[in-house]
Each structure stands twice: as C-alpha cells, then as structure tokens.
C-alpha cells in the first residue's frame, strides 16, 4: 500500500498537479498581485499630473489582471519631475531626444516638454512598462511601448487601456500565473 501511495504521489507531482502553469495572456484567468510596488511621487507634480500618473498605474493594474499593484509610499519606485531635458544628462547620453527616462527604481519626466494630457498619460504608461521590465515593442502599432512617444496611436492617448500586446509582453517578462 505504501508503495502504491508513493507511486501515485510521484506521478501526480510529475504532471504538475497543484502547480500553477504560466499563461501568455493575463486576461485568460484572474491574477493576483504578489508584491505591491511602493512608490513616491515628487511633490513638484501638480494635481493634474498626479492624476495622470495614477491613471497610468491603473492601466497596468487592470491590464495585467491585477498582477501589478502600486501602493503609495515607499521607494520601490520614485517618480521625479524635471524642468529641463539637460537634467537627464547624468543618466542618459541621448538626453536631447527624450522627455522621460526610467533607470532602476527611478522615472524622470521632463514635464514642460509634454503638452497633451493623453500624451502625458501615455508617456507615464510607457515608462511604467520599462520599470516593469518591458523593452520597446515595434512589431505592432497598438502598443504604449514604441521607442518614440509620437508613435503611440492616438486611440491610446484618448482611451487609457493596456493593449493585448503590452499585456503579453508583461507576462513574458514576469511569467504570469493564474490565481488559485
């Protein structure tokens, strides 16, 4: 009897029973946030800019099926406001071409260079994607992760929702699983 029980246990464990398989599409099943990202936002952002940052975080939270969650307070992510592009120079050799930069636990945004509210939100969604480990995506038009913010479709500037391609990129990087 003990031998039979051991054999069944070995068989079940080899089949992965009880293990959660990874999924490519976060919409395929409910997820859960394993670890909230504690963040702080520079006090120099005005209330409208802070609202765009909050909306961008919601895009990732909802678009990943809850696998990403942000919690105010903390230093996992620090979002800073810059007044001029040349302030990016210490971290970015191509600073003249950028309106934002993500490195490590920091996102720097050159606020005066972004006029349109939809563009601002799209820019923050893009930079949060980098913080989550996603690189530039050029194999589809419908993504926030283009190498140039002007390549982001206007529809994404207007309607803040995570495109399927960006959600799949998140799952490729973070190995999404289904909540039990």
Indicate where each model-derived feature is located.
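Metzincin-family zinc-dependent endopeptidase catalytic domain
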Residues: 47-139, 150-152
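A generic secondary-structure signal marking the coil-to-beta-strand transition
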Residues: 35-37, 105, 141
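Short basic coil micro-motifs at the edges of alpha-helical modules that engage polyanionic partners
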Residues: 42, 111-114, 159-161
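Structural signal for conserved beta-strand scaffold positions within catalytic alpha/beta enzyme cores
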Residues: 41, 81, 146-147
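Post-HExxH zinc-binding segment in Zn-dependent metallohydrolases
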Residues: 146-178
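Disordered inhibitory propeptide/activation segment of secreted metzincin zinc metalloprotease zymogens
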Residues: 2-50, 55-58, 162, 171-180
């Amino acid at each position: 009897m003990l031998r039979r029980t051991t054999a069944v246990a070995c068989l079940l464990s080899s089949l992965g029973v009880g293990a959660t398989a990874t999924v490519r599409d976060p919409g395929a099943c409910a997820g859960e946030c394993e670890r909230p990202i504690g963040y702080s936002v520079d006090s120099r952002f005005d209330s409208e800019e802070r609202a765009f940052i909050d909306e961008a975080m919601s895009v990732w939270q909802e678009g990943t099926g809850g696998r990403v969650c942000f919690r105010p307070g903390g230093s996992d992510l620090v979002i800073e406001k810059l007044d001029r592009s040349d302030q990016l120079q210490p971290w970015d050799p191509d600073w003249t071409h950028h309106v934002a930069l993500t490195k490590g636990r920091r996102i720097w945004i050159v606020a005066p260079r972004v006029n349109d509210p939809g563009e601002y939100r799209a820019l923050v969604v893009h930079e949060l994607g980098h913080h989550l480990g996603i690189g530039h995506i050029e194999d589809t038009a419908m993504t926030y992760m283009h190498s140039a913010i002007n390549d982001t479709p206007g529809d994404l500037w207007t309607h803040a929702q995570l495109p399927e391609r960006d959600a799949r990129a998140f799952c490729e990087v973070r190995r999404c699983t289904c909540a039990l």
